[in-house]
């Protein structure tokens, strides 16, 4: 596995391989890899000749009071995991490599990016869309892989690709979970033992949503209220977003029919946990790009 920090050097290497007819898959990450990331890598390895994994903690997607400075980092560990997994190239630029001058250009999807998680993290999704757009321009992959834990992010990136006619197929991969159902996340390392035990309320709330819908509940506002009440059983959990949306568009729904996504954004202690579940048939995340095959694994 070769490691790059230079945009020009990576481009030069990939251009030569593409001229040989090799197709390229990209897995964008912020590092501190876990089994969920490695599932993305495995999917990319199975479907592409060349796999590029990027590790970049993107300052544009962090608010001023968020955890940019303490976000977990261990590039040596990550590189060893990726090498063992058969990744061809690791792109690990510094901030100066990605943003040599202050950014004057921003990619924004105003409606989608200001809803749900975007409502409590202003500017977050503009930062995500901007860095992903730049990574797509640098690597120019045929396919790119994202985890469904970040469901809203997948919808936004697919919409960006469609609106801007970016020739990249966006593939979403099911969420990987611990044995008790908690979605794997690099930020789980922040949880104390007590908070980690409390965090199981998040996947349990998704189970409760599925049960309530299965029992015939169809009013979205009633479901949101019941799920908020359910989360309140755990004193360490503070719900910030409890929402039922159309699974394809993320538009609000009043009546539950077809496919909906139940989206949760819950603070446990000082750590924000993000999770979701799609309930219903015929799911298509964000439109035309190819979705994953499920939500849990």
Curated annotation (Swiss-Prot):
PANTHER family given in the database record: CYTIDYLATE KINASE/PANTOATE-BETA-ALANINE LIGASE (PTHR21299), PANTOATE--BETA-ALANINE LIGASE (PTHR21299:SF1)
Gene Ontology cellular-component annotations: cytosol
Entry GO MF terms: ATP binding; pantoate-beta-alanine ligase activity
Binding site for (R)-pantoate: 61, 153
Enzyme class of the recorded protein, top EC level: ligase
Active site, UniProt feature: 37 (proton donor)
One GO process term, biological-process aspect: pantothenate biosynthetic process
Location of the protein in the cell: Cytoplasm
EC number: 6.3.2.1
Family affiliation: Belongs to the pantothenate synthetase family.
Subunit and partners: Homodimer.
Residue sites binding beta-alanine per the record: 61
Main localization of the protein described in the UniProt heading: cytoplasm
CDD domains per the UniProt record, alphabetical: PanC
Catalytic activity: (R)-pantoate + beta-alanine + ATP = (R)-pantothenate + AMP + diphosphate + H(+)
Remarks, miscellaneous: The reaction proceeds by a bi uni uni bi ping pong mechanism.
Name used for this protein in its record: Pantothenate synthetase
Top-rank taxon, per record: Bacteria
Residues reported in the UniProt entry to bind ATP: 30-37, 147-150, 176, 184-187
Organism of provenance: Rhizobium etli (strain ATCC 51251 / DSM 11541 / JCM 21823 / NBRC 15573 / CFN 42)
Record has Cytoplasm as a keyword: yes
Keywords: ATP-binding, Cytoplasm, Ligase, Nucleotide-binding, Pantothenate biosynthesis, Plasmid
Summary of the function given for this chain in its UniProt record: Catalyzes the condensation of pantoate with beta-alanine in an ATP-dependent reaction via a pantoyl-adenylate intermediate.
Pathway: Cofactor biosynthesis; (R)-pantothenate biosynthesis; (R)-pantothenate from (R)-pantoate and beta-alanine: step 1/1
């Amino acid at each position: 596995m070769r490691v790059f920090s230079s945009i020009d050097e990576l481009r030069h290497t990939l251009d030569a391989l593409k001229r040989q007819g090799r197709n390229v898959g990209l897995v964008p990450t912020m590092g501190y890899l876990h089994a969920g990331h490695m599932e993305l890598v495995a999917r990319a390895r199975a479907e592409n000749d060349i796999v590029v994994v990027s590790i970049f903690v993107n300052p544009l997607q962090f608010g001023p009071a968020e955890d940019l400075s303490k976000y977990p980092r261990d590039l040596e560990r990550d590189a060893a995991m990726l090498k063992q997994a058969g990744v061809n190239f690791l792109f690990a630029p510094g901030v100066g490599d990605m943003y040599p001058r202050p950014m004057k250009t921003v990619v924004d999807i105003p409606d989608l990016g200001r809803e749900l998680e975007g409502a409590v993290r202003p500017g977050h999704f503009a930062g995500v869309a901007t860095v992903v757009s730049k990574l797509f321009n640098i690597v120019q992959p045929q396919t790119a892989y994202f985890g469904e834990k970040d469901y809203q992010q997948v919808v936004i990136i697919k919409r960006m690709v469609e609106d801007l006619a970016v020739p990249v197929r966006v593939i979403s991969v099911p969420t990987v979970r611990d044995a008790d159902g908690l979605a794997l996340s690099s930020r789980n390392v922040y949880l104390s033992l007590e908070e980690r035990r409390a965090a199981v309320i998040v996947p349990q709330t998704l189970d409760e949503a599925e049960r309530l819908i299965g029992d015939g509940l169809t009013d979205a506002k009633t479901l949101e209220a019941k799920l908020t009440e359910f989360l309140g059983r755990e004193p360490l959990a503070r719900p910030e977003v409890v929402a039922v949306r159309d699974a394809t568009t993320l538009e609000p729904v009043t009546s539950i029919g077809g496919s909906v996504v139940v989206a949760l954004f819950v603070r446990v202690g000082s750590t924000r946990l993000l999770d979701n579940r799609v309930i219903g048939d015929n799911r298509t995340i964000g439109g035309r790009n190819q979705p994953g095959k499920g939500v849990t694994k």
